[in-house]
Amino acid sequence: MQDFFANCATVLQKYGFSYLRGAGTTLLLALVGTFFGCLIGFAVGALQTIPVDKQRDPVWKRVLLKILRIFLRCYVELFRGTPMIVQAVFIYYGLLQVFGIKMGMWQAGFFIVSINTGAYMAETVRGGIVSIDPGQTEGAKAIGMNHWQTMVHVILPQALRNIIPQIGNNFIINIKDTSVLSVISITDLFFVHKSVVGALYTYFESAAIVMVIYLTMTLFASYLLRLWEKALDGPQNYDLNTTDSLAYTSGMYNAPDPNHESQNLDMKGGAAHV
């Protein structure tokens, strides 16, 4: 056990900065990929839920939406049904060999994580939109909003709050799954681990260090996401005024405290007297 900690100290002394730089690369890939993946997911999810009226919509619109939905469905199933490491090899090496399309490592990395996350987020967003009470859409139409105004101002803000846990889950998954991008030579945390092992042959020690770093990043990300959820929930220490005694009986509201009310009246009376 002493040799283990001594070896870990030696590895950190020689390659500590490389581990930190690799962790920074991993976080950057996960953060940027999740952000653009969410944008893709919101766009795809919103497009998949465009309503079609067979009586009012012209034929060309119905045909166009049908083709669009088939294309989006193929995109979602393709990138959800294949491993990210295979996608990375196909996009970075395959496109260059077959079509002559050359992408830089960073461009390919961001692109791969974004479109992969977008495929998962598309279904999440679609489910979040469908879960919203249809009365919200009907009410928006009643005041003259069209479909896109309803989506932007009414539906999507509520859907966003409902799918925050899944956004956080995808971010944490991306922190771990970006390790596969070492196959295209991106110097993330796992790439650094392989380099250290190749130099020192400290498989167990280097793997332990990398696991601790990954665990620290995911736990910190989970904590920040919980804070974000609480911030969106707003304060929980207020009660709405109501004169319906049944609301107090059912537990929907807390009954006002008479002592607290009398103290408030005394304070107001004292202030008025002064």
Language-model features: locations:
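Transmembrane alpha-helices and adjacent helix-loop boundaries
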Residues: 1-274
